[in-house]
Design a protein with these regions (language model features):
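N-terminal accessory/precursor segments of enzymes
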Residues: 97-107
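A contiguous, surface-oriented mixed alpha/beta subdomain in the mid-to-C-terminal portion of proteins
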Residues: 1-58, 63-77, 87-88, 98-100, ...
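Low-complexity, highly charged intrinsically disordered N-terminal segments
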Residues: 81-83
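Aromatic-anchored, charged helix-turn/loop surface patch used as a conserved interaction hotspot
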Residues: 105, 110-116
C-alpha cells in the first residue's frame, strides 16, 4: 500500500528548539484552518491531562461541545469535545498549538489536542455527524473508535485502511510524531465505514508501530520512511507474531529495518520466530543473547547465497 497523497511519511523526532519546523506548521495550519466557514478544535480530555478551562469559558458557561455517542454512556469528563475557534493571534488557537507541540515530547502521555477542524457545518450539526462516526460496530460488539488520537490518525490511511474517510469536516489537521502538519481525507457524503475484521487486526498493531517509532532515535540518527516499518509489521504478522507480544514485535521490526530487510529468512532467526510463535522463548530474549558473530553474519547477508541455491535461484 502506498502512502496517501499529501501525507509526509518520513520520520524524525521534533526538537524542542526546532523553531523553523514549528513556525512552518503553525503558519500553514492557520492558513488552512481559517479558510473554512467554521473552525474548531477537537479535544480528548483523557484522564490526567491538565486542561485549562479558562480558555473555553464564556461568561458562566463553556464553549465546549461534547462529542460522544449516547449509546456508550461516557461520563462527561471523559467525552471528547469541540471548541469553536476564531483567528485571533495569541488566543486559544495559538495556545492549543503550543500544547500540541509540547505533547509530542512524551509519546506515552495522553494527547489532549487531537485535531483542528474546518467545516461548513454549524457546531451542533458537526457534533451529530462526528458522534455517529465515533461509534463503530462489528457483529454484536460496539465500541468507541478513537481515530482522532494523532498516534492513531497518522497511520490510518497508509496502514489501517486506504478507504478511511471522515464526513463533516472540510479539513482535518493534526501534528504527527515528527512535528509535521498532516491531514486526513474528508468527504461531504461518505462517512467512516464499520471496519472489516482485517482493519481491526491492523489497528491492534498501532501501539507496536508507535513503540518502534519512539525507539528508533535511540538506535540510529537516520531518518526512516515509515513504509519500512509498516512492511516489517506486515511481515511480523505473516510469520505469526501477535501484537500482544509487543517486545518481540518491536525487536523484530527494528531488526528488519536496521539489520537486514529479509531477516526472517535467516536460518537462526527463523528458529527464534518459530519459538516465539509457539510461546517457547521470546524472540527478543533469543536475539539479545545472540553473539556478535551471529549479528555480523545476519547483517552481511552472505547467508542469502545458500538460501538462493536451495531455492534454485542461483545465477551467473
Amino acid at each position: 500500500m502506498q502512502p496517501e497523497e499529501g501525507l509526509d511519511v518520513s520520520l524524525s523526532r521534533p526538537l524542542s528548539d526546532d523553531e523553523g519546523l514549528k513556525w512552518d506548521a503553525l503558519t500553514s495550519l492557520r492558513e488552512r484552518l481559517f479558510k473554512a466557514k467554521h473552525s474548531y478544535l477537537f479535544v480528548d480530555p483523557t484522564s490526567g491531562v491538565p486542561w485549562d478551562r479558562s480558555y473555553t469559558k464564556v461568561g458562566d458557561s463553556y464553549s465546549e461541545v461534547l462529542v460522544a455517542p449516547r449509546k456508550l454512556n461516557l461520563p462527561k469528563d471523559a467525552c471528547p469535545f469541540l471548541v469553536p475557534l476564531s483567528n485571533e493571534v495569541g488566543g486559544i488557537f495559538d495556545w492549543t498549538f503550543e500544547i500540541a507541540w509540547s505533547q509530542l515530547s512524551d509519546p506515552q502521555a495522553p494527547y489532549p489536542v487531537c485535531a483542528w477542524i474546518g467545516s461548513d457545518l454549524e457546531v451542533r450539526n458537526l457534533q451529530s455527524r462526528m458522534s455517529k462516526q465515533m461509534l463503530q460496530s462489528v457483529g454484536v460488539r460496539t465500541w468507541l473508535f478513537r481515530f482522532y488520537d494523532p498516534r492513531v490518525s497518522q497511520h490510518l490511511v497508509s496502514f489501517v485502511s486506504k478507504e478511511f474517510c471522515i464526513s463533516g469536516p472540510t479539513s482535518w489537521s493534526f501534528l504527527d510524531a515528527s512535528g509535521r502538519l498532516q491531514k486526513l481525507p474528508v468527504s461531504e457524503t461518505e462517512s467512516i465505514r464499520d471496519p472489516e475484521e482485517s482493519s481491526l487486526e491492523r489497528l491492534d498493531w498501532l501501539k507496536t508501530i508507535n513503540a518502534v517509532i519512539n525507539t528508533w532515535p535511540s538506535l540510529t540518527d537516520d531518518i526512516v520512511e515509515i513504509e519500512r516499518i509498516y512492511d516489517a509489521a506486515r511481515v511480523a504478522a505473516a510469520v505469526g507474531l501477535q501484537p500482544c507480544q509487543q517486545a518481540d514485535c518491536v525487536a523484530f521490526i527494528l531488526h528488519r529495518c536496521l539489520v537486514h530487510e529479509r531477516i526472517e529468512l535467516h536460518p537462526i532467526v527463523s528458529v527464534w520466530l518459530n519459538d516465539a510463535r509457539e510461546m517457547k522463548r521470546p524472540y527478543a530474549d533469543a536475539a539479545a543473547h545472540a553473539g556478535a558473530d551471529v549479528w555480523k553474519g545476519i547483517s552481511a547477508g552472505d547467508w542469502q547465497l545458500g538460501l538462493n541455491e536451495r531455492q534454485g535461484l542461483r545465477y551467473g
